[in-house]
Design a protein with these regions (language model features):
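Bacterial N-terminal signal peptides that target proteins for export
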Residues: 2-12
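Bacterial N-terminal signal peptides
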Residues: 11-21
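Cellulosome-associated attachment modules in secreted, modular CAZymes
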Residues: 23-155
């Protein structure tokens, strides 16, 4: 009886551990806007990666001139893998059912440049979008912003 009770407790703990691991891994599969994994989402690297990828560029054309010195991912294969994660899961920023360079790509780029309110949205939200206000779009984009590492603010 005692052995059976211990085994069932062990079984429950194992299930809890596996459930937590599966949940944790599924969260990691979404990706974030820090495409090159340098610890921050930057308009001139990550934003341009997303824009170029949205236009259909791949390989060297995708990464040419955009790899920064602090990038963890430095090859087209690495960058494309990271882009595919965020593109498939969250690339449709305005919620119109499509990932489009001239809407979603420009929204992300503008956001990463620090634009907000009407300057973020004017002229780039699709007519059939479900997220149309600046606050909706800013909220959606901000959910995938990476946390800034401590060294990011070192002077």
């Amino acid at each position: 009886m005692i052995l059976r009770l211990r085994l069932s407790r062990l079984y429950i703990l194992l299930l809890i551990f596996l459930s937590a691991s599966i949940y944790s891994n599924s969260q990691l599969e979404v990706g974030d806007w820090d495409i090159d994994d340098d610890g921050r989402a930057d308009a001139l690297t990550d934003g341009l990666f997303f824009l170029r990828y949205s236009f259909g560029l791949r390989g060297d054309a995708l990464i040419s001139g955009l790899i920064s010195s602090g990038s963890e991912y430095t090859t087209a294969t690495d960058i494309e893998r990271e882009l595919a994660l965020v593109y498939d899961a969250s690339g449709d920023i305005d919620g119109d059912g499509n990932v489009d360079a001239l809407t979603d790509g420009l929204l992300l780029l503008r956001y990463l440049f620090g634009l907000s309110g009407d300057t973020l949205t004017v002229g780039v939200v699709a007519s059939n979008a479900t997220r149309t206000t600046a606050s909706e779009l800013e909220g959606f984009i901000s959910n995938l912003m990476p946390s800034a590492p401590l060294h990011y603010f070192d002077w």
